[in-house]
Amino acid sequence: MKTGIGLPVFPGVSIGPAVVYRKSERCVPVSSGDPAAEQAKFNEAVAAAREQLGALYEKAKIELGEEKAAIVEVQMLMLDDLDYLEGVAAAIEGGAAAADAALDTGEEFAAVFAAMDDEYMNARSADIRDMSHRIY
């Protein structure tokens, strides 16, 4: 039997099979060809992700406690990581669509964390992937 931890859609007790939502594979984004427009798209997506994570953090804090909600807080901090933001900006300047730039840069960072010899840091690779997928 597998055990999982997550946030319920509705409070209470449920009986039945659990469903784990997995985001579908990436759509093929098309760059507008204008790096400034792509950067603006990215900035808007980051702002939306920040709002989503803020709401999720507040819900998790109430339902799971501050310690477990800290995972969401870590993702909110990642949205401000200069290395990540500069990596995305460089990819956009190189002609990438905002979505590709965000996802590819996130994957590069996640791979670095996944390769570390520390279990805690390995787990952060999933947080990085979740954060970059939340943006797009």
Where are these regions (language model features)?
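Non-catalytic, soluble scaffold/interaction modules
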Residues: 1-136
